[in-house]
């Protein structure tokens, strides 16, 4: 007999007093379908036309890289779904400063790009129709939003929205969505902000532009329990294992809680607690000497195959194999599908 996570009254409101107190006004949401004890979703960040090669990446190369590994997993596990967090016009070359002298000068370093960046338009999705078509034909895959350029001035290069006002965030999101409109690439109304960081300006802009959910927090260290809260990367104070409403119920938050360095027992503990096992990967393993521990290479692919197989054997059909977009749809508008064609509003 399948088990469900303990029910929470729909009207419950939780207000946590932190530096993000306005963002953290929200509460639990009834998110699991009847008959499911827990859920699993998988997402990949930093998807863009230059994955593995900032100058060029042919479709044949895509089949051999991260997206090839994803396809292998999708073939092996028919219930698996994936969210590809895709950047509209990727400009990042290095995620860490390479202009080391400038990076040591206070004030000045905050006003300059501390690494070379790609010219605007180099990796614009609409300039790479073969890449867009490749994404469109992937089975059981949805597209999520992952920023406009994935860069900012200052030492924290990927954190694109960190210093922007609400108006600047709105303009950036609108330009990002306009690029998706050029391609006709459908996307789910969810954002994974580059560098995980979220601000009140960004949440206000998300609400204004029709984005319904955000995946800001990542925590791979906090022990699993029904009361555990995220306290690592990005937004702190949100639930570690349950989808949760924030911003007065206007946005849904989803925490990433498992990656390549996590033990299988962590995945099992999340399922036992009736939570959402939100597995994260990055599209590129090594960039400019920086290695992503969760880069989706063959080793990580094989580990995920082991994790998925073990969970299938232990829990069978009691797990909801879902996606961040499907959870957003269920929680924020009650429909089975909430995929937007770029340029539309829900």
Predicted regions and their residues:
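Active-site-adjacent pocket scaffolds in enzyme catalytic domains
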Residues: 2-34, 117-126, 130-136, 182-294
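Active-site beta->alpha N-cap acidic-glycine motif
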Residues: 8-134
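C-terminal domain-boundary segment and adjacent tail
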Residues: 20-25, 32, 77, 213-217, ...
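Generic enzyme active-site microenvironment
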Residues: 43-44, 144, 280, 321
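Active-site metal-binding loops of divalent metal-dependent hydrolases
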Residues: 45-47, 147, 283, 324
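Well-ordered, non-membrane alpha-helical segments in soluble/globular domains
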Residues: 58-71, 121-131, 166-174, 260-264, ...
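Loop/turn elements at helix/coil->beta-strand transitions in domains of secreted/extracellular proteins
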Residues: 77-83, 138-142, 185-187, 210-212, ...
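Metal-dependent polysaccharide deacetylase catalytic core of the NodB/CE4 family, i.e.
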Residues: 83-199, 223, 279-291
